[in-house]
Each structure stands twice: as structure tokens, then as C-alpha cells.
């Protein structure tokens, strides 16, 4: 087991983790370490190839990968160390109040890191179909927007050609446009609430400009198909989603 001591360990090398590391270094902390489970830094930004990032921070419009690259460059200029392909398996509290982080990767094997502070910057997870309580069987062809975005933008694979999107947050709107640009037919975007959860400009640029209908107070009541999705039944709901 390899052992090391740090002042701050940041779990997650996406935009939040990189920003936290840079802020810690600017505040005078020298022993900062980023642990990232993926093979590269940048997190979710690497699959967000649309523009719209960086206006507040860099005063110019960037794509997700460009925005991530700016932060990665700043972290490397600040000589902030990071470990890739590294999975954290445990965090525990030591008797003196410090924390012990256990992590593992192929190069170092098992790592034991003692640190004053642990910053959790692992991002978030999308709600699954199960969490949304949509009735029906479990055929192929059901994806979260982030997974579909990963397949299209990173893997170069289309998850389908006839699409219904449930949820009108920004990623749902952006993926509606992306699927059309890749040749799919987006039947509609359904939104449970009485208003869209996305920015107005995304509604205009991603839906209106591509003639994609937005159905408010609408959700998926049933999924049809056994081996693969064959269709869905949409239903209207009230403002409380019932």
C-alpha cells in the first residue's frame, strides 16, 4: 500500500474539482491532490460539445471541452497534481480529526492518503427511469439524456432514430437539437411541470428553430415494447404533476 499526506484531497476532476483546486492553491494551500476516476480531467464538460460556457469566467463563449481545457491548463500551470483512473473506495475519520482516504488505481495499487480536508466534487447523477416511476417493461432504447449525449458525442453512436424526450431541462433541450442534427426524428419534448426547466434561449434555439413541439404538464404514462421500445403513451397532468 502506498501512503501519502495532503492538506486537501479533491475527489472529482471535473469543473467543480478543478475550480476548487485552483481556489485552494490561490489561498496558499500547497499540498492539494485531485483524484479522478476517468482517464482524463474535465468531467461532464468533455461530452458537452455545444457552446455557451465561459461567458462569466472567461468573457467569451466556449464549448464544454474548450472550457474544461482552460481549467486543466490553469491547474497544470499551478502544478496541481492529479491521479487519473483512480477510484476512491473509503473515507474515514482518524482520532486526531484528520481524514483517511483509500483509493485504488492500476499504477499505484492501493493508496492510503491522510488529509486535513476532503472536498467532494463528483458531480451528480441523473434520475433513472425507475426513480421516475414510469410503468411498463424494460426494453432497450431508454436512456438518460446524459447517457445519450455520451454515446453521440463521445462514442459516435446513435441511441435511436425516433425519439421522445421526457424533461425540458437544458440537457434535454440540447439533446433534442443534437439528435435532429444527427438525423433522428424528435417527436416531442414532454415536461411534467407547467413551464420548461431550461433557459429561454435553449427553448428557442433547440426546439423552436427545429420545429420540435414542447408539451407542458405532460408525462410518460406507459412504455410499450418488449425487446426494444416501440412507443410511449403520454398523459396530461395538473400543476402538481398528478
Regions found by a protein language model. Give the residues of each.
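Short, basic, helix/turn surface patches
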Residues: 58-72, 112-117, 213-223, 242
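Predominant activation on well-ordered alpha-helical scaffold segments within soluble catalytic domains
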Residues: 21-22, 69-72, 116, 143-149, ...
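Short, ordered loop/turn segments at secondary-structure junctions
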Residues: 37-40, 50, 87-88, 123-125, ...
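Beta1-alpha1 glycine-rich phosphate/pyrophosphate-binding loop at the start
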Residues: 6-70, 74, 160-202, 213
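A Rossmann-like FAD-binding core segment of flavoenzymes
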Residues: 75-103, 180-242
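A generic local secondary-structure boundary/capping motif
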Residues: 23-24, 107-110, 153-155, 175-178, ...
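Ferredoxin-type iron-sulfur electron-transfer modules and their immediate structural context
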Residues: 2, 51-55, 125-128, 223
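FAD-binding core/adjacent interface of flavoenzyme oxidoreductases
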Residues: 1-11, 69-162, 238-241
Amino acid at each position: 500500500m502506498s501512503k501519502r499526506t495532503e492538506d486537501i484531497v479533491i475527489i472529482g476532476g471535473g469543473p467543480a474539482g478543478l475550480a476548487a483546486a485552483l481556489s485552494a492553491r490561490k489561498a496558499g494551500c500547497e499540498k492539494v491532490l485531485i483524484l479522478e476516476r476517468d482517464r482524463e480531467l474535465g468531467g461532464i464538460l468533455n461530452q458537452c460539445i455545444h457552446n455557451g460556457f465561459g461567458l462569466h469566467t472567461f468573457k467569451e463563449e466556449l464549448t464544454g471541452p474548450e472550457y474544461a481545457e482552460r481549467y486543466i491548463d490553469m491547474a497544470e500551470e499551478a502544478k496541481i497534481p492529479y491521479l487519473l483512473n483512480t477510484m476512491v473506495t473509503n473515507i474515514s475519520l482518524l482520532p486526531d480529526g484528520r481524514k483517511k482516504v483509500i483509493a485504488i488505481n492500476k499504477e499505484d495499487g492501493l493508496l492510503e492518503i491522510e488529509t486535513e480536508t476532503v472536498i467532494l466534487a463528483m458531480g451528480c447523477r441523473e434520475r433513472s427511469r425507475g426513480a421516475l416511476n414510469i410503468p411498463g417493461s424494460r426494453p432497450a432504447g431508454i436512456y438518460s439524456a446524459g447517457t445519450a449525449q455520451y454515446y453521440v458525442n463521445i462514442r459516435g453512436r446513435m441511441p435511436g432514430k425516433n425519439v421522445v424526450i421526457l424533461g425540458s431541462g437544458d440537457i434535454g433541450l440540447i439533446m433534442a437539437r443534437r439528435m435532429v442534427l444527427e438525423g433522428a426524428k424528435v417527436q416531442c419534448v414532454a415536461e411534467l411541470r407547467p413551464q420548461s426547466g431550461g433557459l429561454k434561449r435553449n427553448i428557442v434555439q433547440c426546439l423552436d428553430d427545429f420545429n420540435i413541439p414542447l408539451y407542458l404538464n405532460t408525462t410518460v404514462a406507459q412504455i410499450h415494447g418488449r425487446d426494444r421500445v416501440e412507443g410511449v403513451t403520454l398523459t396530461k397532468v395538473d400543476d402538481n404533476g398528478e
